[in-house]
Amino acid sequence: MDTDLAPSVEKAAAALKAGGAREPGEQLRSLLSELRSRFEALYGPRLVRLMLFGSQARGDAEPGSDIDVLVVLEGPVRPGKEIARTGEIAAGMSLENNVVISCTFISADQFEREESPLMINVRREGVPV
């Protein structure tokens, strides 16, 4: 695993463990690292960042809670198109790890400028992956 990612992945693993999720920390680290690698291979330099958000990032997840990931991309983003492009990756990893991975897609410009409740919370509570 990239050492630059290690602290972020460790923080995400601790948040999941603290939230009562069924995933052991090592499995979460592996899942997040694999998700990032697959998205980097798919998007290349267009991938700006991945952020874990929601109950898992806050540490108040319950057993069975999903893993919410914000995917920030350079350039225009059509969420439906991105869901179609990544659906097989997310579904396969969800089945392999017995957890639901939910991806939300947004452009880098929107991430920086949008003031929706979701973006405010992601900026405040999100964990970089």
Where is each model-derived feature located?
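Short beta-strand->loop micro-motif that forms the acidic, two-metal-ion catalytic signature
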Residues: D68-V72
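Catalytic core of pol beta-like nucleotidyltransferases
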Residues: M1-V48, A57-P63, E74-V129
